[in-house]
């Protein structure tokens, strides 16, 4: 009997929430998957522990100041150790790699994702900012190099699964569900005084700090709307957001005959991660199952874009196109970092993003170099606005 060739996986951002859960998936299926490379930004101690456990071919620490510590700690293992942004971009091109999981946070994921696509690697996309910033460019590259992009976000994985078997059937609407976050029922007055401690308590999902704040402000859902446009080839007007506090229905697709397909499951990121790894197959898992006897109250409501302006700003950037989503992403990364340092209020984040949108040079048909310049300019302006 022929032995199944194990898929070689590279995880960009292995020490974050998605990365650690991806390693749980791999650990559950050692007969199918093998870790080829692990990368991290700063969490060197966790990266060391992961390397010792999973014995990858190589590890990369983006922060070059941590290189010596990493190198010394792994000196007794046959693991290659690299550091820096350039190494991050090069490691994804390694011949044996089959799948690159892009689980890095923010704009930093763009360049390595582009390199992985050019190298013909299947992309398990968890870094939504890549498509927010440069969706058109990424799609062009994916077509050129015939590289599959498999969504890892639970919502986009849900849509992806709903579209299985529907080739040629026109989509009328993509319906992305949102939990509404921890402040769903808060008044504008209450939102003025919310703290980072409150914002970091998501009701349903275990996530990293940045995406948890984005979920609280609904910018995460705005980014997911933009991501859906590029992943599924739909127009902005075909993407609807519905608040579904229980997070049981992960998203839906409505077809031209009015029929709606939905994907349901437990709010567990390991499920979409595993599907991205195993696609087009489904494989067994030990993860919790949905108990319908406990799903006695599934509710839906419209998002309030007056209280959660970030969702409206994301839609506006998508309609305007060009480098505008890149501007919004850069400004958002700056304001979220400032909010986590207690330098800006929760509602103040939207003000800075909106003003940044009005001040950065607009480019209708941006190149990669335009995105780089836009990101730098938007960050500078957002920081200046925070300091005023």
Curated annotation (Swiss-Prot):
Asked whether the UniProt record includes NADP among its keywords, one would answer yes
GO biological process entries: isopentenyl diphosphate biosynthetic process, methylerythritol 4-phosphate pathway involved in terpenoid biosynthetic process
Per its UniProt record, the required cofactor names are: Mg(2+); Mn(2+)
Swiss-Prot/TrEMBL keywords: Isoprene biosynthesis, Manganese, Metal-binding, NADP, Oxidoreductase
Instruction: State where NADPH binds.
Output: 15-18, 127, 129, 208
Question: Which superkingdom heads the taxonomic lineage of this protein's source?
Answer: Bacteria
Database matches in SUPFAM superfamilies: 1-deoxy-D-xylulose-5-phosphate reductoisomerase, C-terminal domain, Glyceraldehyde-3-phosphate dehydrogenase-like, C-terminal domain, NAD(P)-binding Rossmann-fold domains
Q: Does the keyword Oxidoreductase apply?
A: yes
Name the residues that bind 1-deoxy-D-xylulose 5-phosphate. 128, 154-155, 179, 202, 215, 220-221, 224
UniProt catalytic activity:
2-C-methyl-D-erythritol 4-phosphate + NADP(+) = 1-deoxy-D-xylulose 5-phosphate + NADPH + H(+)
Binding positions for Mn(2+) per the UniProt entry: 153, 155, 224
Report the Pfam families cross-referenced here: DXP_redisom_C, DXP_reductoisom, DXPR_C
The pathway noted for it is: Isoprenoid biosynthesis; isopentenyl diphosphate biosynthesis via DXP pathway; isopentenyl diphosphate from 1-deoxy-D-xylulose 5-phosphate: step 1/6
A GO molecular function held by the record = manganese ion binding
Q: What is its EC number?
A: 1.1.1.267
Q: Which NCBIfam families match?
A: Dxr, PRK12464.1
**PANTHER family tied to this protein:** 1-DEOXY-D-XYLULOSE 5-PHOSPHATE REDUCTOISOMERASE, 1-DEOXY-D-XYLULOSE 5-PHOSPHATE REDUCTOISOMERASE, CHLOROPLASTIC
HAMAP family under this entry? DXP_reductoisom
What this protein is reported to do is described as: Catalyzes the NADPH-dependent rearrangement and reduction of 1-deoxy-D-xylulose-5-phosphate (DXP) to 2-C-methyl-D-erythritol 4-phosphate (MEP).
Q: Spell out the family assignment given in the record's similarity comment.
A: Belongs to the DXR family.
Question: Under which name does UniProt file this protein?
Answer: 1-deoxy-D-xylulose 5-phosphate reductoisomerase
Name its species: Bacteroides fragilis (strain YCH46)
């Amino acid at each position: 009997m022929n032995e199944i060739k194990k898929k070689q996986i590279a995880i960009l951002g292995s020490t974050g929430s998605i990365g650690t859960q991806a390693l749980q998936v791999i650990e559950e299926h050692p007969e199918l998957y093998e870790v080829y490379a692990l990368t991290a930004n700063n969490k060197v101690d966790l990266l060391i522990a992961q390397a010792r456990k999973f014995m990858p071919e190589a590890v990369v620490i983006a922060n070059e100041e941590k290189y010596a510590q990493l190198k010394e700690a792994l000196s007794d293992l046959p693991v290659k150790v690299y550091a820096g942004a350039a190494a991050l971009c090069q490691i994804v091109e390694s011949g044996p790699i089959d799948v690159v999981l892009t689980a890095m946070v923010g704009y930093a994921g763009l360049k390595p994702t582009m390199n992985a696509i050019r190298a013909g690697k299947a992309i398990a996309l968890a870094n939504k900012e890549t498509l927010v910033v440069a969706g058109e460019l990424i799609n062009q590259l994916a077509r050129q190099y015939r590289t599959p992009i498999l969504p890892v976000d639970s919502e986009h994985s849900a849509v992806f699964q709903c579209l299985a078997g529907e080739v040629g059937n026109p989509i009328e609407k993509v319906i992305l569900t949102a939990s509404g976050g921890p402040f769903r029922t808060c008044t504008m007055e209450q939102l003025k005084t919310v703290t980072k401690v409150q914002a970091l308590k998501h009701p349903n999902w275990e996530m990293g700090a940045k995406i948890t704040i984005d979920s609280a402000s609904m910018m995460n859902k705005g980014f997911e709307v933009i991501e859906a446009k590029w992943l599924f080839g739909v127009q902005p007007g075909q993407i609807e957001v519905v608040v579904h506090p229980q997070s049981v229905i992960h998203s839906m697709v409505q077809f031209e005959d009015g029929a709606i397909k939905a994907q349901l499951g437990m709010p567990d990121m390991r499920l979409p991660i595993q599907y991205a790894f195993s696609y087009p197959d489904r494989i067994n898992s030990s993860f919790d199952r949905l108990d319908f006897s406990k799903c006695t109250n599934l509710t839906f409501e419209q998002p309030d874009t007056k209280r959660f302006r970030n969702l409206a700003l994301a839609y506006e950037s998508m309609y305007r196109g060009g480098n505008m989503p890149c501007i919004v992403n850069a400004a958002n990364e700056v304001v979220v970092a400032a909010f986590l340092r207690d330098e800006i209020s929760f509602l103040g984040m939207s003000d800075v993003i909106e003003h940044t949108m009005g001040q950065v040079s607009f480019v209708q048909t941006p190149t990669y170099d335009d995105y780089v310049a836009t990101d730098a300019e938007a960050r500078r302006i957002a920081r200046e606005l925070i300091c005023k």
